[in-house]
Amino acid sequence: MTCKIIGCGGYLPPKVVSNDELAKFVDTNDEWIRTRTGISQRHIAGDTEYTSHIALKAAEKAIADADISVNEIDLIITCTTTPDNSFPSVATKLQGYLGLNNVPSFDLQAVCAGFVYGVQVANSLISSGKYKTILLIGAEKMTSLLDWEDRATCVLFGDGAGSVILQRSDDNSGIIDSNIFSSGADYEILYTNGGVSMNGSSGKIIMQGQKLFRLAVEKMHQSIEELLRNNNFTVNDIDYFIPHQANVRIINKLAELLNVEDHKVVKTVEKHANCSSASIPLALSTLKASGKIKKGDIILFSAIGAGLTWGSALLRW
């Protein structure tokens, strides 16, 4: 038994900040940002627009897309690095917004790899027979973690949420396989310099960009090769490749190493920037809305995030 995605939805806050606007208060310019990242703009949530609020909007779109009653959902998993509160979880707040009394809900924190981790967890829970319909969300207000004077990081991130409905599959569609990994020895490559038990603050993002670029390509490449090999697939079998939308140079280098044709690679980083755990479900929602996906298509997800955490998932639509 496996599970399949029966609906998806994405939400981006209405406020858009272009590179030119960013250059008014940061020592940067549009050419510098585009050349190094491929990003032209990012969406930024308002001061009173929290992660749970943007998660709800993405969830409602996924529920509508799946054409199910909200009461069919029997578990909620929210992948996030930027919760509203230290506790309770975003997922339980979302459960309350949706009126799903007693439905178990929890947050999963694997930073930018969170959605891939969430896919594996949700698939395992549905495959066990314990749950039938899971709402899985990646939602982030990454701009709350930015030092707006650090041009190496503040140009990279945006806010947004993406959501999917996963349900038991009775045919050959659904999650084929996935893998997840972590390496705590590399945590200083990307982290925040704050935390509840450290100094009582959320901190700001600290990143070693060159090291992260190299490891991102290396780790995702290894993860994908292993996943394809273990399931007797080749790159030629892939119809759409949806990598984490962190940086177009990482995406292009990974696609080059894998020899994936460019028209199969989904790229939303230019307009979305890096939305961490929301980036893959947002990209999936964008692809689905384009009408290009057809039943039977093979889709590959891959992501890497702080931790380090990384992994990939293979599914048949």
UniProtKB/Swiss-Prot annotation:
The keyword Cytoplasm is annotated on this UniProt entry: yes
CDD domains the UniProt entry points to: KAS_III
Enzyme Commission code(s) on record: 2.3.1.180
Subunit structure of this chain's protein: Homodimer.
Compartment(s) of residence: Cytoplasm
Entry's Gene Ontology BP terms: fatty acid biosynthetic process
Described function: Catalyzes the condensation reaction of fatty acid synthesis by the addition to an acyl acceptor of two carbons from malonyl-ACP. Catalyzes the first condensation reaction which initiates fatty acid synthesis and may therefore play a role in governing the total rate of fatty acid production. Possesses both acetoacetyl-ACP synthase and acetyl transacylase activities. Its substrate specificity determines the biosynthesis of branched-chain and/or straight-chain of fatty acids.
Active site residues of this protein: C112, H244, N274
GO cellular component: cytoplasm
Protein's name according to its UniProt entry: Beta-ketoacyl-[acyl-carrier-protein] synthase III
Claim: Acetylation is one of the keywords in the record: no
Family of this protein: Belongs to the thiolase-like superfamily. FabH family.
NCBIfam families documented for this protein: fabH (TIGR00747), PRK09352.1 (NF006829)
Record comment regarding domains: The last Arg residue of the ACP-binding site is essential for the weak association between ACP/AcpP and FabH.
GO molecular function: 3-oxoacyl-[acyl-carrier-protein] synthase activity; beta-ketoacyl-acyl-carrier-protein synthase III activity
Pathway(s): Lipid metabolism; fatty acid biosynthesis
Pfam families: ACP_syn_III, ACP_syn_III_C
Reactions that this protein is recorded to catalyse: malonyl-[ACP] + acetyl-CoA + H(+) = 3-oxobutanoyl-[ACP] + CO2 + CoA
Keywords assigned: Acyltransferase, Cytoplasm, Fatty acid biosynthesis, Fatty acid metabolism, Lipid biosynthesis, Lipid metabolism, Multifunctional enzyme, Transferase
Region listing for ACP-binding, in residue ranges: 245-249
InterPro entries: ACP_syn_III_C, ACP_syn_III_N, FabH, Thiolase-like
SUPFAM superfamilies listed in its UniProt record: Thiolase-like
